Amino acid sequence: MKIGHISDLHWLDLSGARIRDFFNKRLTGGFNLVAGRAKKHTKQAVIDALDAMRASGVDHLVVTGDLTNLALPSEFKAVMDTIDGYFDAAHRTIVPGNHDFYTRESARCDRFCHYVYGDDRSAQGDCILCGNNPWPFAQIRDDVCFIALNSAQPRPWFVAAGRLGTHQCDDLATLLARREIASCYKIALLHHHIVRVVKAPGESLRCLDDRKQFLDTCQNGGVDLILHGHNHDFSQFKVGNTLISEAGSCSVSHFKRDNRAGKFNIYTIEDKRLVDVATWRYEDGHYKPWRHVTPSDFKSLPIGDIP
């Protein structure tokens, strides 16, 4: 199976937006757009990534959050209309990022789930849920299990950190113990990063608050691969028996540092093993193959080194 991984699309669409829609945290997002984010992240780069994935024979698409810039209805509709043209609901798994839960209003009405999954997740027969909780849920495709988690929640201005909460970690452990899941190659999906790549004072305002609890649950439950976004940076780590991977933002078409260029990954799973990770990089106006690695190339980190 070939699994395509994109993240941090930051799709911008202000159709129908009103002035009063910006009397909240969107005000800071608006300043970021004026300051250059709107030029840095482009829709065409996302479309080029999806085109390249389709041409490469990707079987299943994974999106690890930040589909939108400001969690506006117009943004969700436009980005999902685009994704629908490449991968239908049976061939994709999507989790939210902090930009998809940008305001309390967008979280309260669960705009993300309305546009991405519909209003009744339990009506989707292929989703394995834990009781009445919407997150996490599992989807099994062949011998691969995708477990989707929600690390996004409305936070104060200038805070972009994530949290899963005890109930999601407990439900994750319950899902991992199920017989039909335990026998699969298990991939956990969330938006926020676990390993603090940049050790700056403000990093605590960006990373996953309960990353140690989450990683312990993954280790104990036999998660093979964790895919995330949020950093807009390429990184590949191995902690214990669990691989952790981020390609970067797939929508970045203008960049100053090479590591911040638009990227996406294609993971090849054979016989319940990850055999190849192909990373594509945006340059000269389109995506090109950049590098291939195997699990042995991931940087090993002792569990105690996760700050």
Q: Model-flagged regions — what are they?
A:
Residues 269-307:
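A short C-terminal boundary segment appended to hydrolase-like catalytic domains
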Residues 84, 203-272:
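Conserved beta-sheet core of the metallophosphoesterase superfamily
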Residues 1-76:
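N-terminal active-site segment of His-dependent metallophosphoesterases
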Residues 5-7, 60-65, 92-98, 150, ...:
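Active-site neighborhood of phospho(di)ester-bond hydrolases with catalytic His/Asp-centered motifs
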Residues 1-4, 136-148, 177, 183-185, ...:
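Beta-strand-turn-beta hairpins that frame and shape the catalytic cleft
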Residues 73, 78-171, 219, 266:
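Extended active-site neighborhood of metal-dependent phosphoesterases/phosphodiesterases
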Residues 10-14, 69-72, 98-106, 154-159, ...:
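Active-site environment of divalent metal-dependent phosphoester hydrolases
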Residues 159-163, 179-224, 231:
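Active-site-proximal segments of metal-dependent phosphoesterases and phosphodiesterases across multiple
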